[in-house]
Design a protein with these regions (language model features):
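Acidic di-acidic motifs
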Residues: 14, 76, 126
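Core segments of cupin and vicinal oxygen chelate
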Residues: 2-3, 9-51, 79, 86
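Conserved short beta-strand elements that form part of the metal-binding/catalytic scaffold
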Residues: 28-67, 74, 92-93, 116-117, ...
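Hydrophobic alpha-helical segments, principally membrane-spanning helices and signal/leader peptides
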Residues: 11, 61, 110-111
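Vicinal oxygen chelate
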Residues: 32-33, 72, 81-143
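Generic signal for short, ordered secondary-structure residues
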Residues: 1, 63, 107-108
């Protein structure tokens, strides 16, 4: 039997502010369903992803900003970071695991010199403080 993650729910404080942020991040709006007061579902999908995110009203009791350590993988971290910064999104500096082969939680500034998959990353947060890590993964070399 196979399993796949379909949707992750993010707790947010203001649906419209979050919607604008994730659209600026490049996510496509799949659903914006608001059948009654107090209930709204917004679902978005990152480009190229099989998994979506959702947020809204009446979906979760979790506090806004409590979804931490979410990952988005990109084929070129420097290019992705530059594009997001140009769109007005605050993205932390790029860092990489060191040493990669025996990594124990230490980082060095910049991209991994060998551009190994899963070694380089940069962080960002949505307006509520839900955190994301952009991680460089070249699918050609990760296989």
């Amino acid at each position: 039997m196979g399993y796949a993650i379909e949707v992750l729910t993010l707790p947010v404080g203001d649906v419209d502010t979050s919607l604008a942020f994730y659209k600026a991040l490049g996510f496509a709006v799949d659903v914006d369903y608001h059948p009654r007061d107090g209930f709204r579902v917004v679902q978005l999908t990152p480009p190229g992803s099989a998994c979506s995110i959702q947020f809204g009203e009446g979906l979760t009791d979790a506090g806004p900003g409590s979804a931490c350590a979410n990952y988005l993988v990109v084929p070129d971290l420097a290019a992705a970071r530059a594009e997001l910064v140009a769109r007005g999104i605050e993205v932390g500096e790029i860092r990489h695991k060191t040493p990669v082969d025996t990594w124990a939680g230490e980082f060095a500034a910049g991209l991994d010199p060998e551009r190994r998959p899963y070694a380089s990353m940069a962080d960002l947060a949505d307006p509520d403080g839900n955190t994301w890590t952009l991680q460089e993964v070249s699918r050609a070399t990760a296989a």
